[in-house]
Amino acid sequence: GTGNISSGLIESSKEPINLNADSNEWFKLNPDQTGFYRVNYQPNDLSKLEEAIQDGDLNGKDRLGLQGDAYALCRAGYSSVSSFLSLSRAYSKETEAPVLSELASGLRGIENLIEGSEFHNRYIEFCRSIFKNIAENSGWDKKESEGHLQALLRSTALSNLGHYGDEDTLHQASAKFSL
């Protein structure tokens, strides 16, 4: 999106920033991910960004950066895993392969930590819900004018659905590839 752009020097590792923003509107720090820093949003602000992702208001660089920051911050203990997972839900209509690939990597990282726990089955269902719509929109077969990134988007969605045990995907793959 477009909006007000401000710049300043952050002189410490933790420095609050006062924004003159409408409290009902979303804002994105580090637009296009040009800075080498992570942004840890307050829960209310992250919720507004989730809506912006779902509404298609953020470009691919910003969608990639948001989920990358959220995952890195939860891994480092600066934010909760539930914060990253809540943001992840907003990517169920993702259209760009690099964004989906990075998200899939983060989701797999969390799965590795909870595998065998009482939460694992619900987590698998949650992950399937993210990839299902993307796979349905991408289909199984290459389209005539499709580029390599669209093929990568499709393969990322389908392979993750297979990994997370989606029955429809497993049956289709079995029939398609005579397994």
Give each language-model segment a name.
Residues 1-179:
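Non-catalytic accessory/interaction domains
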